[in-house]
């Protein structure tokens, strides 16, 4: 085996042994702990699959902002968590270099001290994140000013990647009919809807139709919010199962969802998703009580109305369909077994253990 700091060999297996090297961002403030496959006869990547997606990172030598490295490290930690989930779900993930048409890239930018703020958002595969979102005080002030119950780096990433996957997996496909049925007409003026959101209160009783007030802004935002919550659910349930956390032995008062709340209640796998959904409800009820016992905000400060449940089921059907494979795109899975988080538990396991 080569230098143990830089290269490893996979455990012996019938097939040829795969060699790996550390991501070079381990030695930077990103502190990346992912590995990179080494292929004989090919120039090796120096960055892992998550770090290769960065187009722009903060200036780590900026004397005016010596905290750039610390803030960047927090952002990269959240980004790795995002991509460990996406890879475990088998979703297509590639950089713009690897896939100039459908690839993903990130600009992690700090707002200039005397200029307009960097706006977090997505456009054609490019996700921009304001570096100051990694400053807890700044982010909490924004959360309070915008009257949001929840604002995290991971939440930002899951929301913005939702916009990417709408372009990538929904737009122009057979899924558009279901999208229009559940989320509405995305052709309405997006900029005008955003302006209206910041000038006016959300619709009356928005909580009966949306997972958040911001989701009521425009069908694209409704989609991205629901996508983020679907990833919250999948990752949290997976973590709970991986750690052996069970709720079936605890009496928890909650009203279970029934099949009629789903997008396709007659789907062959409808009961599987329903069990997953009710497992989520039990788990968040438990975790909210745990948070309150420490004087902390609720772990999951949201309520899922039936209309949102139908949207989540729609997203689940899309994610589990593999329909994008028909377009000739294989999901990028090279890093799945290298993630430090246990992401390989199946949904059926979650039903039997929670």
PLM region spans:
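Active-site-adjacent bridging/hinge elements
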Residues: 129-140, 192-206, 261
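Compositionally biased, intrinsically disordered low-complexity segments enriched
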Residues: 335-353
């Amino acid at each position: 085996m080569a230098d143990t700091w830089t290269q490893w060999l996979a455990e012996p297996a019938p097939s040829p042994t795969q060699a790996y090297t550390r991501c070079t961002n381990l030695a930077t403030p990103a502190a990346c702990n992912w590995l990179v496959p080494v292929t004989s006869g090919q120039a090796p990547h120096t960055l892992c699959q998550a770090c290769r997606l960065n187009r722009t990172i903060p200036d780590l030598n900026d004397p005016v902002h010596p905290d750039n490295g610390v803030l960047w490290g927090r952002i990269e930690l959240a980004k790795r968590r995002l991509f460990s989930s996406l890879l475990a779900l088998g979703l297509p993930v590639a950089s713009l270099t690897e896939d100039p048409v459908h690839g993903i890239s990130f600009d992690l930018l700090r707002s200039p001290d005397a200029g307009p703020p960097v706006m977090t958002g997505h456009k054609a595969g490019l996700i921009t994140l304001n570096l100051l979102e990694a400053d807890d005080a700044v982010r909490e002030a924004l959360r309070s000013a915008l009257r949001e119950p929840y604002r995290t780096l991971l939440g930002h990433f899951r929301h913005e990647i939702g916009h990417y996957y709408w372009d990538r997996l929904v737009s122009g496909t057979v899924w558009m009919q279901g999208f229009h049925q559940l989320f509405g007409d995305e052709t309405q003026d997006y900029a005008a809807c955003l302006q209206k959101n910041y000038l006016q209160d959300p619709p009356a009783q928005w909580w009966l139709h949306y997972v958040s007030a911001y989701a009521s802004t425009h069908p694209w935002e409704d989609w991205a919010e629901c996508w983020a919550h679907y990833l919250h659910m999948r990752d949290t349930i997976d973590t709970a199962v991986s750690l052996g956390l069970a709720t079936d032995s605890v009496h928890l008062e909650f009203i279970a969802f029934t099949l009629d709340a789903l997008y396709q209640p007659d789907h062959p796998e409808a009961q599987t998703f329903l069990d997953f959904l009710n497992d989520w409800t039990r788990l968040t009820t438990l975790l909210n009580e745990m948070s309150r016992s420490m004087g902390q905000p609720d772990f999951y400060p949201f309520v899922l109305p039936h209309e949102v449940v139908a949207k989540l089921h729609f997203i689940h059907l899309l994610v589990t369909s593999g329909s994008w494979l028909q377009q000739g795109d294989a999901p990028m899975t090279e890093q799945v077994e290298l993630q430090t988080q246990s992401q390989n538990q199946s949904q059926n396991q979650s039903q039997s253990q929670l």
